[in-house]
Amino acid sequence: VPSRAVIAVTNDAANAIETVGVTYTLGESEAQIATATFSKPLTPGATGIAQFAFTPEAIGANQLLSLKISEVNGQPYVNENAYPKTATITVIEEGSGFDRNVVIEEKTGTWCKFCPRGIVGMEKIKADVTDGTLIPIAVHTSDPMSTTSYSGIEYAIDGAPSAMVNRNFVSIGQIDPNYNDLKLAYEIARKDPAIAEITINSVEEDASATKFDISTRFAIDESSARYRIALVAVEDNVGPYPQTNYYSGTNVDLDGWEKLPNPASTIFNDVARAIKSYQGLSSSIPSTIEAGTTYSYTKGFIDNTGIKNRANARYVAMIINSLTGRIENATSIPSPSSVALDNIGAAENEGPVRYFNLQGQPVENPTRGQLLIRTCGSKSSKIVF
């Protein structure tokens, strides 16, 4: 199956790089040599993306790809201190994969003075991507919205604000959650098909837990599969809480945060209330899977007591690859308790329609793309104007 590999290369030399020769092995196959090209010459000190074509010998999951650079601009390259880079890949037949949804897990906190940058980035990319393929989760640490069940993120990424996309640290890595980086990472993640799909057939809420009926389906056969289902409860319109705001009084254009005080009273979205579990639930997916077969899982449940208002909640189900740690695919549905209020009109509830930003400030003239709270009488809803 003809395939392509994308690699990141940093130029530590004094001259530009146009091509690199890559010596690689896949699984137990013999070493092969390929030429990786850049879209434009890589200048000294810069890091760029190159890709090369290769043909795997077999279709299957979790194959080890090992490579090293052996040529630069057609000339032999030897670096005694360089170790081969490795990645675990899955090879599927062309056209046999599934549409890939993108999970962005952002590490944030009200104590973090730069985190307004992530708040703006997440809201803007949500305004761009409205087809359900984006699943944003804001994981708060050391503030009133934090949950110990999501402490795994502390070991996965450093500092705040920061984010990971499908937990893919090979082709994407840890990123800053500004809008431009989030959008690029989303586009990269969406390009490749997923090896599996996951569906939440139904959820049932009671006073302390939410129970799930979930199905999964794979595009490959695997006899020693190591996949697990993870469940997340997320809530919007949380707060207000005081958000530390470095941008207050600066000349940085950050969607109005530069005009807000420090700290700024803020309503938060996409707040992770609980996850079960960060590594995924054991025995939630069989160890032997067959392509095209649907597997049901009805034993999953999650603590929902952290949710303050179920009308603002939604639930996420993810397939975790236990070997690589990556999210192979995910899906999200609103809480059954949520009420669709997006089409509120004055006739439905007496009173004028008014708009507020996430800090609770009135917005007289909304502009296209803004995420706002819309009120009408006693009713309110979160909308993208």
PLM region spans:
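Short acidic/proline- and small/hydrophobic-mixed sequence motifs that coincide with surface turns
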Residues: 14-19, 224-226, 363
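Asparagine-centered strand-capping/turn motif at beta-strand->loop junctions
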Residues: 8-14, 218-220
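Short, conserved sequence motifs used for protein processing/export or organelle targeting and
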Residues: 34-43, 74, 132-338
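Residue-level detector of functionally pivotal "anchor" positions at catalytic/ligand-binding pockets or at interdomain
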Residues: 1, 88-102, 332-362
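C-terminal tail/sorting-segment detector
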Residues: 373-385
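Intrinsically disordered, low-complexity Pro/Gly/Ser/Thr-rich segments with frequent PxxP/GP/PP motifs
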Residues: 30-59
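Terminal connector regions
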Residues: 58-94, 314-328
